[in-house]
Curated annotation (Swiss-Prot):
<comment type="similarity">
    <text>Belongs to the isocitrate and isopropylmalate dehydrogenases family. LeuB type 1 subfamily.</text>
</comment>
<feature type="site" description="Important for catalysis">
    <location>
        <position position="194"/>
    </location>
</feature>
<dbReference type="GO" id="GO:0005829">
    <property type="term" value="C:cytosol"/>
</dbReference>
<dbReference type="GO" id="GO:0000287">
    <property type="term" value="F:magnesium ion binding"/>
</dbReference>
<comment type="pathway">
    <text>Amino-acid biosynthesis; L-leucine biosynthesis; L-leucine from 3-methyl-2-oxobutanoate: step 3/4.</text>
</comment>
<dbReference type="GO" id="GO:0051287">
    <property type="term" value="F:NAD binding"/>
</dbReference>
<keyword id="KW-0432">Leucine biosynthesis</keyword>
<feature type="binding site">
    <location>
        <position position="254"/>
    </location>
    <ligand>
        <name>Mg(2+)</name>
    </ligand>
</feature>
<dbReference type="InterPro" id="IPR019818">
    <property type="entry name" value="IsoCit/isopropylmalate_DH_CS"/>
</dbReference>
<feature type="binding site">
    <location>
        <position position="108"/>
    </location>
    <ligand>
        <name>substrate</name>
    </ligand>
</feature>
<comment type="subunit">
    <text>Homodimer.</text>
</comment>
<dbReference type="GO" id="GO:0003862">
    <property type="term" value="F:3-isopropylmalate dehydrogenase activity"/>
</dbReference>
<keyword id="KW-0100">Branched-chain amino acid biosynthesis</keyword>
<keyword id="KW-0963">Cytoplasm</keyword>
<keyword id="KW-0520">NAD</keyword>
<keyword id="KW-0028">Amino-acid biosynthesis</keyword>
<comment type="function">
    <text>Catalyzes the oxidation of 3-carboxy-2-hydroxy-4-methylpentanoate (3-isopropylmalate) to 3-carboxy-4-methyl-2-oxopentanoate. The product decarboxylates to 4-methyl-2 oxopentanoate.</text>
</comment>
Length: 358
């Protein structure tokens, strides 16, 4: 029997509540599909600060090093906002984890499920078509990290500058991740650039076009970033995998998230070249609703499904979870963030319904 070690970092706010439901679902699929997940739980974020004084304790990092994947909840909250920036939960835990594991590839799915069209802010006829896409964003290169960057001069002569830098190998590895993702989906990649203006985008387009030769089954399209933001609003159903540089992916992934209508539904993954991943909901720790049993656990559950698919290659089990989510939503069950009536299901009830639908 295949066996995998999972470091479980529930974190703060609604993290522990929604993580409990993801574990419920994972226990069901491992039993049904015949593999073994060994869960090891560790403190992270504010919970770790309260427990031992550090947002990312050595014991937690060691546990992650020994794991095959990290299932992450959420970190942060008003309790810890007065700490020095590098000791706050987000900057002191999540960013060091990304750096330590060299997580260069961010996957952000955005799906509009049947029955949830009215939450989509787009025109009704566009929302009625639905959409199911994933944004593949390069995380470690580009203008956020390029040198030189800085600020100099005085008065009206003050200037500030940033540099967009991409090496070919950085583009090759993120392009490969996008094509591999497309192979597990609808076999279409739309590469986003600004090759009519930027040298970095010209290299991006050339490199992605070369990489496409290794994936003859996948259709490749190129689109300028300005047009991409328009087409996301006009025809989101036309996209499958969107391949983006760091800054373009930052913008596009948030735009795609917003048109789904609920952040509580959106998972994400950050991967390194070995396929090791950190999987987490795209939303935050929502301290205002923590402990009330009303948080939507679907983003955490779908993050667990992504872990099965992208780190463990357990596609059948991942499909089963995603289908169960669709089934439960189609049958009209909603948590408070999506409920039409005065009787929404609780966090635990939603987790149980999805587990039963597998």
């Amino acid at each position: 029997m295949q066996s995998y070690n999972v470091a479980v970092l529930a974190g703060d706010g609604i993290g522990p509540e929604v993580m409990a439901e993801a574990m419920k679902v994972l226990n069901k699929v491992q039993e049904k599909f015949g593999f073994k997940l060994n869960f090891n739980e560790f403190f992270v974020g504010g919970a770790a600060i309260d427990h031992c004084g550090y947002p990312l304790p050595a014991e937690t990092l060691k546990g992650c090093d020994e794991a095959d994947a990290i299932l992450f909840g959420s970190v942060g909250g008003p309790k810890w906002t007065n700490l020095p920036p590098d000791q706050q939960p987000e900057r002191g835990a999540l960013l060091p984890l990304r750096k330590h594991f060299k997580l260069f590839c961010n996957l952000r799915p955005a799906t509009l499920y049947k029955g949830l069209e009215k939450f989509c802010p787009l025109r009704a006829d566009i929302a009625a078509k639905g959409f199911d896409m994933v944004v593949v964003r390069e995380l470690t290169g580009g203008i956020y990290f390029g040198q030189p960057k800085g600020r100099e001069g005085e008065g009206s002569q003050t200037k500030a500058f940033d540099t967009e830098v991409y090496y070919k190998y950085e583009i090759e590895r993120i392009a490969r991740a996008a094509f591999e993702a497309a192979m597990k989906r609808n076999k279409k990649v739309t590469s986003v650039d600004k090759a009519n203006v930027l040298q970095s985008s010209i290299l991006w387009r050339e490199t992605v076009t070369e990489m496409a030769k290794d994936y003859p089954e996948v259709t490749l399209e190129h689109i300028y970033i300005d047009n991409a933001t328009m087409q996301l609003i006009k025809a989101p159903e036309s996209f499958d995998v969107l391949l983006c540089s760091n800054i373009f992916g930052d913008i596009i992934s948030d735009e795609a998230a917003m048109i789904t209508g609920s952040m509580g539904m959106l998972p994400s993954a950050s991967l390194n070249e070995a396929g090791f991943g950190l999987y987490e909901p795209a939303g935050g720790s929502a301290p205002d609703i923590a402990g009330k049993g009303i948080a939507n656990p679907i983003a955490q559950i779908l993050s667990a499904a992504m872990m099965l698919r992208y780190s463990f290659n357990l596609n059948e089990a991942a499909d089963a979870i995603e289908s169960a989510v669709q089934k439960v939503l189609a049958s009209g069950h909603r948590t408070a963030d999506l409920a039409d009536d005065s009787t929404p299901v609780s966090t635990a009830e939603m987790g149980t319904l999805i587990t039963q639908a597998i």
